[in-house]
Amino acid sequence: MSARTSLHLAAEIGGPPHYDAGHYLRLAGLAEDGALDYVTLGDSFARPGLDALAVLARVAPATDRIGLVPTVTTTHTEPFHVSSAVATLDWVSRGRAGWQADVSTTEAEARLFGRRPAAPPAAPPAALWQEAGEVADVSGRLWDSWEDDAEIRDAATGRFIDRDKLHYVDFEGSTFTVKGPAIVPRPPQGRPVTVIDATTAPAREAAARHADVVHIRATTPEQAAAVRDEVRRKAAGHGRDPEALRVLVALTVDLGDVETAPEPGLESGPQLAGRGTYFRGGPVDLADLIAQWHRSGAADGFHLTPITPERDLERIVNGTVALLQHRSLFRTFHPGGTLREHLGLVRPASRYAAARTAAKEA
C-alpha cells in the first residue's frame, strides 16, 4: 500500500495514574509488538499524575520502533522549553518523537502557576488555540534554526559549530516572543511530528495550520470523511499540501466482556461520549469496523483509547490488529525507524538552510 492509503493505528497508554515506569514500558512494548505507528500519553495540569513527556523519555531507550507522543499543554509553558523538550525526546528515541499540543482552560490550572488568569468566560477557546498554534509554529522554526550539518566538532580549530548555520527565528506571537536559535541541535526527524486533537472548531483551525496528524471525532464513515475533507481543505487554504496530513478517527474502546451482547444503542458502531466516541464490542467487531471505514476512504486510520489499558490494549494488539494483519490490511512490522517514516511523512528540510542556499545562488 502507498503511504497515502496505508492504514495507520495508534493507541493511548494513559489511564488511572500509575507511578511505576514498568507499567508504561509494558504497554508501549505491547503496542510496538503490534507494529502500531505510535502511542500517546495524555497529560493535563487539571489532574495529578506524572509528566507525560518525562515518562516517554523513560520509555524511549526500552523500545526500538514505536512512536512516542506525549500531550504537552501550551497555555502555561514557555514555547522555548516545549521545543527543547520535544527535540530532546526525538534525540533519545532516535527519531520517534511527536507531541500532542493541548490547551489549559480552567482557572484552577491557572492558579497552579499564578502567572496569568484563565481566559474569562467571554473569551473563546480560540484565543488559547491560536496561542497553541503559535507555539507549534515557533517550535518548528526553532527545530530548523540549526542546520543539519551545523555541528562540525573540529578539534584542530576548537570550533564546535558553524555559526553561519545557526539562525535567529525572531518570532513574535500574540502572547510571547522568541529570538532563538535553539540550544538543542536539529532533531533526527528534522521536525518531530505535531499531533492535534481537533474535536473542537478552534482546535481544528490550529490543526489545519500546523498539525502533521489530526485526531477527529466521528460516528459514521460519512461524518469522518466530511471532517477530514474540511481539515484538508483548510490546510490547503494555508498553503499546505493536504495530502501530507494524516487524519485518524479518535475512538474510545471497551473490549471487556465480549460474551455479553452489546449495550442497547452500541450495536451499530461508535456512539458519542463526551468529547470523543465510544465503541463496545469484541476484537473482531473492532477489526471489522476499522476495515470498513478505512476501505471506504473515510480516514487514514484510528487512534484508540482503551477503557482499561492493561486489558483492552492486549486485546487490540493480539485480537484486532492480528486479524487486520491476517487480512493484509495492516503491516506486520515497522518498515522504517522514525515516526515520520511510519506515517509516510517526508523529513522536512530546514527553512533557513533553504533560504541561505537560495541567497547564495541569487
At which residue positions do the language-model features occur?
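N-terminal beta1-alpha1-beta2 module of alpha/beta enzyme domains
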Residues: 1-62, 189-192, 337, 355-361
